């Protein structure tokens, strides 16, 4: 797309908005003020738009001709009355049932929710919450994503802060990632025309984006007059990689239905800083909708034995996208955790992330398996079994476990022998194991009473190194005017594998270990003493940032932002020989609050 082409699209959009403004001008003063501004803008743009656009035939009174589309991919017919009643005033519906813009895109529930919020905030659309939820549900179900399309970008919906690398096109990644993750892009499907209109939207909302983000390397060289703009390159790639119509969506939409997931589920997971947990989730179908459910989860942390009960509700969009919200018993109503999970085909497994926080930074990874008549294995704690260890107590959790079982029936594989059954009940089995000193290092599957758990335990002979995760963390000061963004760290132990070399493909992850945590200065600016002002870290690895705003105790009256090293120190206890401590560190950036956000900090999903 040339610069003139981009201007033409923008002018067409402005002309369309001008038509809406003219139709909306009535005797209401609040509407008159807003509409007059747009009408004045029309006077400056209509002439240029008319010159850029070929003359069209006569348009019947009260209708607006839909702009000619270069991409002839057929759009989706929209029949929902709530959508038509609330959206057709601007998004014109043609005789076949296609609506401008809306019929030519597909998104996740979060993507449609953001569009609805943007219409309310920026276009003054008056929409009550019930209608907004109904519209979001309709589009998520009828113009959503197939499982194969949604899974590569699930980290976006699960609000994970990860270092994702988009490898399909490096130029597109450079163009888009300056402002948002590629997960937001990968969670959408559009026609080429819609991708181009999205470009126009970016330029309309952010007029300096061409120079601040799209050309981050500076202006183009003088001899590049014919070179395509970075956004033109991105649009070409996105239209090819993420088109509106795909075989995956055609196949999924043909068989899509509300999942029948009511009943008991075995829950297992891990929360950074608190460790693994296991329990049960009871799912009850709503009496009013087949895709809405109420939930009750009860689970216990392996370290410390804390028992948590949560009650909530959930909607499953597009037949597989679980979106829920639950509260811990006795906790304030505003402390709810959001739940994002994927229901696997067959309706026997679910997995995802539950999270909370001002920036969704607190979270736990969860996996669920449907409970049937037979035994189900959920987790093993501790997973790490040291070679040569004797009388090591291990707890196996699950459901429908046999009360009467023999030690030899609990099979951890070669080199691991169960010597004693300490306690057995339907939800847990406590055993004592012995590991041969010559046992091969690596993962072990567990088999018990016809049930299996892949990678249930890890056999190791020594801890070669530790790694702090995340390797690059970020926190935001807050607490005065904006919420704080915390950062949770974990220390993971590793075995170097058969080649005895670190950071190679055969390395074995042993799992989280208890360490001593501390902060050290990150040498960026001489004598800035960031470590004194940015915040503190506790012995669970949780970093708490300082207050936002200027600090009079700091030179230059600066904010409490900066860079520090997060340092973990681990003392191995292998055969009681007092091995030397192992250290690892990660970089932590403590920055300012996120001052401008499209999405509110709190609200209904």
Question: How would you describe each model-predicted region?
Answer:
Residues 52-83, 122-124, 131, 146-170, ...:
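Electrostatic cytochrome c docking/interface patches
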Residues 84-95, 135, 172-184:
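The canonical Cys-X-X-Cys-His
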Residues 92-122, 181-207, 309:
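Gly/Gly-Pro-rich "capping" loops immediately C-terminal to redox-active cysteine motifs
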Residues 124-154, 208, 213-252, 256:
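C-terminal capping alpha-helices of c-type cytochrome domains
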Residues 180, 255, 259-346, 351-358:
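Central antiparallel beta-sheet cores of small beta-barrel/beta-sandwich binding domains
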Residues 247, 255, 336-379, 584-594:
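Edge beta-strand at a domain terminus
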Residues 369-408, 425, 453-503, 600-604:
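Beta-strand/beta-sandwich contexts
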Residues 388-451, 510-513, 520, 530-534, ...:
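Immunoglobulin-like IPT/TIG beta-sandwich domains and homologous Ig-like subdomains
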């Amino acid at each position: 797309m040339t610069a003139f082409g981009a201007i033409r699209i923008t002018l067409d959009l402005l002309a369309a908005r001008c038509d809406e403004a003219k139709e909306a001008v009535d005797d209401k003063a609040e509407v008159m003020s807003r509409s007059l501004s747009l009408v004045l803008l029309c006077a400056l743009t209509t002439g240029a738009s008319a010159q850029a656009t070929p003359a069209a035939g006569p348009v019947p009174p009260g209708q607006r001709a839909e702009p000619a589309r270069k991409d002839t991919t057929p759009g989706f017919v929209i029949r929902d009355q709530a959508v038509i009643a609330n959206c057709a005033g601007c998004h014109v519906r043609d005789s076949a049932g296609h609506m401008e813009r809306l019929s030519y895109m597909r998104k996740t529930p979060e993507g449609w929710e953001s569009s609805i919020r943007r219409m309310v905030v920026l276009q003054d659309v008056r929409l009550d919450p019930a209608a907004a939820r109904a519209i979001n549900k309709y589009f998520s179900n009828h113009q959503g994503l197939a499982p194969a399309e949604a899974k590569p970008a699930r980290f976006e919906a699960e609000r994970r802060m990860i270092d994702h690398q988009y490898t399909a096109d490096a130029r597109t990644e450079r163009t888009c990632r300056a402002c948002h993750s590629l997960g937001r892009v990968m969670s959408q499907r559009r026609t080429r025309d819609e991708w181009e209109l999205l470009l126009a939207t970016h330029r309309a909302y952010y007029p300096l984006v061409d120079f601040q983000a799209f050309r981050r390397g500076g202006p183009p060289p003088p001899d590049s007059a014919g070179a395509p703009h970075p956004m033109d390159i991105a649009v070409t790639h996105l239209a090819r990689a993420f088109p509106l119509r795909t075989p995956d969506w055609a196949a999924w939409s043909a068989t899509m239905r509300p999942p029948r997931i009511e009943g008991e589920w075995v829950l297992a997971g891990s929360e950074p800083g608190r460790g693994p947990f296991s329990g049960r989730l009871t799912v009850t179908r709503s009496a009013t909708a087949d895709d809405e459910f109420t939930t009750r989860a009860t689970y216990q942390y392996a370290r410390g034995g804390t028992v948590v009960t949560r009650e909530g509700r959930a909607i499953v969009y597009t037949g597989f996208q679980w979106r829920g919200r639950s509260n811990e018993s006795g906790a304030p109503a505003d402390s709810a955790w959001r739940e994002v999970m994927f229901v696997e085909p067959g309706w026997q497994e679910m997995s995802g992330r539950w999270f909370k926080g001002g920036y969704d930074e607190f979270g736990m990874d969860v996996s669920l398996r449907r409970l049937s008549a037979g035994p189900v294995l959920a987790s093993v704690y501790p997973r790490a079994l040291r070679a040569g260890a004797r009388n090591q107590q291990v707890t196996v959790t699950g459901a429908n476990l046999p009360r009467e079982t023999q030690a030899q029936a609990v099979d951890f594989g070669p080199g691991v022998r169960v010597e004693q059954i300490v306690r057995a009940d339907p939800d847990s089995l406590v055993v004592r194991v012995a590991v041969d000193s010559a046992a091969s290092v690596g993962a072990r599957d567990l088999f018990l009473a016809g049930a299996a758990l892949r990678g249930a335990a890890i056999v190791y002979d020594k801890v070669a190194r530790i790694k702090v995760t995340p390797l690059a963390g970020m926190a935001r000061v807050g607490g005065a005017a904006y919420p704080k963004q915390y950062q949770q760290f974990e220390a993971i132990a590793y075995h170097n594998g058969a080649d005895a070399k670190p950071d190679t493909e055969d390395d074995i992850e042993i799992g989280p270990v208890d360490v001593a945590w501390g902060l050290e200065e990150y040498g960026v600016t001489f004598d800035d003493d960031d470590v004194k002002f940015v915040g503190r870290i506790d012995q669970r690895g949780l970093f708490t940032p300082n207050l936002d705003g200027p600090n009079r105790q700091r030179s230059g009256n600066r904010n409490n932002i900066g860079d520090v090293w997060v340092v973990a120190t681990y003392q191995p206890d292998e055969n009681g020989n007092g091995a030397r401590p192992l250290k690892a560190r990660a970089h932590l950036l403590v920055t300012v609050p996120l001052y401008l956000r499209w999405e509110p900090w709190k609200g209904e999903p």
